[in-house]
């Protein structure tokens, strides 16, 4: 299986609008305006396809037969040729220009336009990787200068330019005896001579000439967007630790969604429209006869919008909450459980990239509904003969045994692991493995349906079809068989609705509407295209073929209309029939009906539970009054402990309490929590969290003028951890980590930072290098159970 990387394409479109597009032929007949209309439509469709599918392609537009001249070679005699747009990304402005384009007033030479187009391609693609192509759209009614033709041919081959000629009013085929210009040359018209010449020229440069009607049909067909072929995985397929096969993975199937909508400024749009109107008025005043673009008048206003989000508390809407002060909360019952960034990082599972075989199973043991997510295809590493042979033999063995392999798949380093399965696929020219995710028990929806199989003893007899019904069903299936609905030229059946040839009608209709809206912003969306309508409606060939089978099936399975119950509630007193209905059930005369196992079940309802003793009003369920509570009070207002889930926020909330003084308690609890995090940490698991707590404790002590409490605690930690079991934590918080974490090391609070501190700058500089005596830390309460109890306290 070979993979090709599509290159960017540089295209020059040459459109003939000269006098020949509307002139009289030599036989006296007058060509209709459909010639130039077909030419414009073909160029418009080409631009439209490039706008939709060719995201990286660039186009230029050249006109032949204009009254004026505008090109880089005009000083050398290339007259009546106008370059409307250089080779650039296609734009809506070019489409609008084409829509309002009028026929030219002069005659231009086709060969001269090809030379101008090649000059544009050379200037654009010099030292760049581009595929180069020229589209020439003409009816060949104007004279063509054939001098120096060999030089033009050589230049085409030298710069490797592909030529596509779209012939307006060209014959689909020309007989060989008519291709010779020497035969009956006098009897041929100028158009016939030019048509023969262009066919020969296109063939000499390996180009293609297509009549305009055929070109319109091809460009009107649906097509899919070209995408860059990139590997999604490069690594080894590990069958055993001793057997590893290098493979490459590619994305094979992914749902194509509609393009995402972006918000734009309506105010800026109005300003652009005003500028465009002013520019049009200026062009009229200048009488711009050559249809040249005025670059100075183009709007310089952008429609893009920058979106900024601000957060405010419901109870304190005047103060903005900064993003660093926000954290995520997960709903657990009726409570919100806050999770800090550190907690989220701890929840993530880190794994190395791998594609490891877990085991093998029969292919029939994996139902079709187990396919999840996108499909990937795996092939052997290109150029590695040993891996090709090993993978090929392995795939053929899976096919012979009708088995698939279950694998553990981690696409990238530290990525999420997936359980999936790989199916072998063998073709005449390549072999590969297709991969899909396997669902877990949480992903599968289990539903209970009433049995309808004739072989099931629990099936009701009324649900078992008879022989005639089974025969009618089989005939209906056979008549609508997509494998036998169409036939090729040899009479062999062809499968209908192949996914590779069936395009999404929603996407196609969207792009047509998008194109229409870009050119006509104030008109209605166009009606559904007939070709798209064929996609969304049943195929007429199949429907005609199965018409009798559908009738027989309807006769064998007659449908009876069910009783339609009134939707007027009986308890409202407005319905004398005593019936009520809602979405899921129906009540008639005090009996509530609902569907169960395909049957309508009735259940008697006691209306006393719905009305008061006097029958005046329905009872209302009592609801607890939570008007005095708010989310802020729930998660912060009544905090009296520094927990393990979010100790930093708990500490802040306790310091901010105004109904009681909890400063001393908050500092004491924070000290205990820091020591607990360090002692309970598996290696450095909680070091960062403890580090954040120490930083916040230091800030809080400075704020509350409790510098001595922090300085004493820091000295106690040095005695406890330095040069001991947790010396790595002491080095973690006191090392110069500015270049790594962007944070300064933890140190004492000095007199310059807080008036209550007695630490001088000299003592600060000596502190981290000073050795101290052994210190016994204060006892930590509920070290083993505090985190669990604290979690339940938060939930309650």
Swiss-Prot record:
Q: Please report the stretch or stretches of sequence annotated as the Ku domain.
A: 240-471
The VWFA domain, residue ranges: 10-205
Which Pfam families does the protein's record reference?
Ku (PF02735), Ku_C (PF03730), Ku_N (PF03731), Ku_PK_bind (PF08785)
Its principal location?
nucleus
Which GO terms of the molecular function aspect are on file? ATP binding; damaged DNA binding; DNA helicase activity; double-stranded DNA binding; hydrolase activity; telomeric DNA binding
Q: Where is this region: Disordered?
A: 272-302
So which domain of life are we looking at? Eukaryota
Broadest EC class assigned to this enzyme: hydrolase
Tell me the leader sequence span. none
- EC number(s) of the enzyme? 3.6.4.-
Keyword DNA-binding applies = yes
List localization entries.
Nucleus
InterPro entries reported for this sequence: Ku70/Ku80_beta-barrel_dom (IPR006164), Ku80 (IPR024193), Ku_C (IPR005160), Ku_C_sf (IPR036494), Ku_N (IPR005161), Ku_PK_bind (IPR014893), SPOC-like_C_dom_sf (IPR016194), vWFA_dom_sf (IPR036465)
Segments traversing the membrane: none
A Gene Ontology biological process noted in the UniProt record is:
DNA recombination
Biased composition range(s): Low complexity: 272-285
What keywords is this UniProt entry annotated with? ATP-binding, DNA damage, DNA recombination, DNA repair, DNA-binding, Helicase, Hydrolase, Nucleotide-binding, Nucleus
Entry GO terms, CC:
chromatin; Ku70:Ku80 complex; nucleus
Give a yes or no for keyword Membrane in this entry.
Answer: no
Quaternary context: Heterodimer of ku70 and ku80.
Q: What does the function comment of this entry state?
A: Single-stranded DNA-dependent ATP-dependent helicase that plays a key role in DNA non-homologous end joining (NHEJ).
Question: Member of which family?
Answer: Belongs to the ku80 family.
Domain notes per entry: The VWFA domain interacts with the KBM (Ku-binding motif) found in a number of DNA repair proteins.
Which named protein is this? X-ray repair cross-complementing protein 5
């Amino acid at each position: 299986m070979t993979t090709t990387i599509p290159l960017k394409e540089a295209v020059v479109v040459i459109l003939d609008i000269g006098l020949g597009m509307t002139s009289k032929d030599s036989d006296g007949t007058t060509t209709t305006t459909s010639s130039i209309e077909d030419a414009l439509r073909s160029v418009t469709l080409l631009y439209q396809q490039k706008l939709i599918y060719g995201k990286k392609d660039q186009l230029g537009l050249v006109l032949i037969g204009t009254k004026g001249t505008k090109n880089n070679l005009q000083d050398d005699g290339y007259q009546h040729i106008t370059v409307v747009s250089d080779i650039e990304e296609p734009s809506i402005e070019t489409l609008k220009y084409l829509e309002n384009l009028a026929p030219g007033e002069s005659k231009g030479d086709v060969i001269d336009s090809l030379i101008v187009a090649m000059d544009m391609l050379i200037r654009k693609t010099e030292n760049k990787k581009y595929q180069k192509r020229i589209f020439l759209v003409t009816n060949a009614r104007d004279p063509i200068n054939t001098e120096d033709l060999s030089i033009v041919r050589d230049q085409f081959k030298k710069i490797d330019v592909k030529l596509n000629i779209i012939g307006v009013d060209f014959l689909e085929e020309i007989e060989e005896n008519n291709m010779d210009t020497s035969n009956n040359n006098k009897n041929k018209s100028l158009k016939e001579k030019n048509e023969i010449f262009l066919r020969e020229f296109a063939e000499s440069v390996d180009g293609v000439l297509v009549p305009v009607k055929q070109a319109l049909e091809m460009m009107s067909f649906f097509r899919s967007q070209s995408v860059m072929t990139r590997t999604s995985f490069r690594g080894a397929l590990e069958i055993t630790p001793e057997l590893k096969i290098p493979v490459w993975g590619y994305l094979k199937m992914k749902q194509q969604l509609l393009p995402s909508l972006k918000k734009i400024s309506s105010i800026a749009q109005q300003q652009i429209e005003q500028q465009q109107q002013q520019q049009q008025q200026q062009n009229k005043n200048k009488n711009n006869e050559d249809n040249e673009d005025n670059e100075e008048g183009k709007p310089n206003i952008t429609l893009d919008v920058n979106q900024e989000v601000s957060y405010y508390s419901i109870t304190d809407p005047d103060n903005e909450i900064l993003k660093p002060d926000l954290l995520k909360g997960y709903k657990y019952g009726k409570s919100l459980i806050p999770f800090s960034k550190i907690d989220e990082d701890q929840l993530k599972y880190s794994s190395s990239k791998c594609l490891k075989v877990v085991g093998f199973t029969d292919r029939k043991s994996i139902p079709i509904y187990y396919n999840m997510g996108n499909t990937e295809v795996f092939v052997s590493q290109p150029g590695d003969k040993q891996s090709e042979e090993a993978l090929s033999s392995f795939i053929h063995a899976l096919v012979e045994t009708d088995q698939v392999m279950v694998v553990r798949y981690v696409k990238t380093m530290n990525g999420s692991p997936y359980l999936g399965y790989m199916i072998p696929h063998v073709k005449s020219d390549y072999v590969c493995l297709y991969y899909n995710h396997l669902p877990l028990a949480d992903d599968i929806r289990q539903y209970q349906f009433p049995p309808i199989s004739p072989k099931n003893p629990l099936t009701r007899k009324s649900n078992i079809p008879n022989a005639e019904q089974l025969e009618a069903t089989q005939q209906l299936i056979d008549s609508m068989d997509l494998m036998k609905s169409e036939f090729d030229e040899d009479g062999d059946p062809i499968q209908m609705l192949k996914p590779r040839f069936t395009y999404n009608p929603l996407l196609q209709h969207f792009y047509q509407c998008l194109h229409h809206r870009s050119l006509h912003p104030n008109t209605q969306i166009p009606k559904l295209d007939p070709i798209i309508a064929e996609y969304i409606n049943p195929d007429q060939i199949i429907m005609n073929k199965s018409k009798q089978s559908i009738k027989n099936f309807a006769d064998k399975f007659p449908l009876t209309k069910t009783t339609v119950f009134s939707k007027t509630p009986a308890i409202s007193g407005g319905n004398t029939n005593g019936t009520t209905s809602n979405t899921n059930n129906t009540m008639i005369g005090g009996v509530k009906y609902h569907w169960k196992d395909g049957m309508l079940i009735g259940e008697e309802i006691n209306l006393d539970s719905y009305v008061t003793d006097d029958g005046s009003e329905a009872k209302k369920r009592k609801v607890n009054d939570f008007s005095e509570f708010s989310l802020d009070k729930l998660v912060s207002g009544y905090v009296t402990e520094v927990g393990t889930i979010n100790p930093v926020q708990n500490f802040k909330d306790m310091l901010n309490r105004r109904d009681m003084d909890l400063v001393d308690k908050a500092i004491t609890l924070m000290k205990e929590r820091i020591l607990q995090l360090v002692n309970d940490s598996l290696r450095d698991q909680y070091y960062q969290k403890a580090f954040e707590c120490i930083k916040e404790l230091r800030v809080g002590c400075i704020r509350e003028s409790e510098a001595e409490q922090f300085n004493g605690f820091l000295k106690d930690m040095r005695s406890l951890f330095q040069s001991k079991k947790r010396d790595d934590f002491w080095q973690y918080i006191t090392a110069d980590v500015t270049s790594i974490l962007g944070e300064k090391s933890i140190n004492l609070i000095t007199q310059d930072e807080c008036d209550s501190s007695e630490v001088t700058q000299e003592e600060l500089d000596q502190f981290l290098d000073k050795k101290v005596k052994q210190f016994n830390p204060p006892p930590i309460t509920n070290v083993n159970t505090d985190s669990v109890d604290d979690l339940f306290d938060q939930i309650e």
